[in-house]
Amino acid sequence: MTSLLLNAKCLVVKVGSSLVTNNGAGLDKGAIAAWADQIARLVKSGRQVVLVSSGAVAEGMQRLGWKKRPVAINELQAAAAVGQMGLVQMYESCFASHGLHTAQILLTHADLADRKRYLNARTTLRTLLDLGVIPIINENDTVVTDEIRFGDNDTLGSLVANLIEADALVILTDQPGLYSADPRKHPDAQFIQYETAGNPALEKMAGGAGTLIGSGGMLTKILAAKRAARSGAHTVIASGREPDILVRLAQGEVVGTHLKAGQVKTLARKQWLADQLRVAGKVVVDEGAAKALREGGRSLLPIGVMAVEGSFERGEVVSCVNTAGEEIARGLVNYSALETARILRQPSHEIEHILGYIDGPELIHRDNLILV
């Protein structure tokens, strides 16, 4: 067996808070220098690397003299704003010693939800990689709200992997990888070395939140791997405490949990649709429509819609759920919530008569719809 990273040319590496801080008390320069050294070796071997690094909040807490991680979002935003300066400066200094340039990229969900901004971000990142620059990515904490935040850097890392169509996502944590149960509570827990990303059994086994310093538990990592697999990216979850972990993985050594992207790669536009973490509303579909969506790859017609939930406008992303509330698909809707409520259960030829205009016979065209 060899590492899934052996032939990977473009990597997204996510480094957790505990791996770049002194137990949450500010940044650990020695640790960051070591990460820069490993990534520099990968770049000089011909690979492209995007770094998603935690640590801004912890550094901000240190600079502000806060001992306890704040709960209020405005205080977290303030800590992140202060700490981001130190985080980027330290990475810049460490990479400069290897003759490499870095670039700071701060993203929000709104950047990736808007198709034009999404494509612009992809072009910029690809250009930076072609120039041999190391993009250092984080969430733009100072402007996000609780409703539109990524929530953790595992999620952000997977979205970036999809954005640039990376070959692999590496999630480095303070744990060796994924177990069948929490090994701290269950000594007989089995270590999972190889599995397919998206296997439902993994989500059932994954635990809750991690340390007090970070924000992501194993479940977020499993979901991140599932998301990254849509663009064909394999995921490795491994301990950042292992010496030269990135270099060893790139050389083919099997360390940590390897989650293979077993599914067929999703088309770029549909992948973007699937990556939308927030939906504007829901439409409840009947059994016939649910079957047509699942099995036939059909468009969603108004006649198959039973109810509308939420307030959405034309062109926004909505979730399609069955009568049991289970999400089947999501897509870009052709009509607003108010208009949808007027035409639901109606045949498509009645749309123009009811609304006074028609923007297509489908509520959601199959080209703008993806199964989930």
Curated annotation (Swiss-Prot):
CDD domains: AAK_G5K_ProB, PUA_G5K
Binding residues for ATP: K14, T173, D174, S215, G216, G217, M218, L219, T220, K221
Start and end residues of each PUA domain: 280-358
Record-listed E.C. numbers: 2.7.2.11
Residues forming coiled coils: none
Gene3D superfamilies noted in UniProt: Acetylglutamate kinase-like (3.40.1160.10), PUA domain (2.30.130.10)
Pathway(s) it belongs to: Amino-acid biosynthesis; L-proline biosynthesis; L-glutamate 5-semialdehyde from L-glutamate: step 1/2
Catalytic activity: L-glutamate + ATP = L-glutamyl 5-phosphate + ADP
UniProt-listed Pfam families: AA_kinase, PUA
GO biological process: L-proline biosynthetic process
Domain of life, source organism: Bacteria
GO CC aspect terms: cytosol
Positions annotated to bind substrate: S54, D141, N153
GO molecular function terms noted in the UniProt entry: ATP binding; glutamate 5-kinase activity; RNA binding
Localization in the cell: Cytoplasm
Keywords from the UniProt entry: Amino-acid biosynthesis, ATP-binding, Cytoplasm, Kinase, Nucleotide-binding, Proline biosynthesis, Transferase
Enzyme class: transferase
Function: Catalyzes the transfer of a phosphate group to glutamate to form L-glutamate 5-phosphate.
Family recorded in the similarity comment: Belongs to the glutamate 5-kinase family.
NCBIfam families documented for this protein: proB
Name of this chain's protein: Glutamate 5-kinase
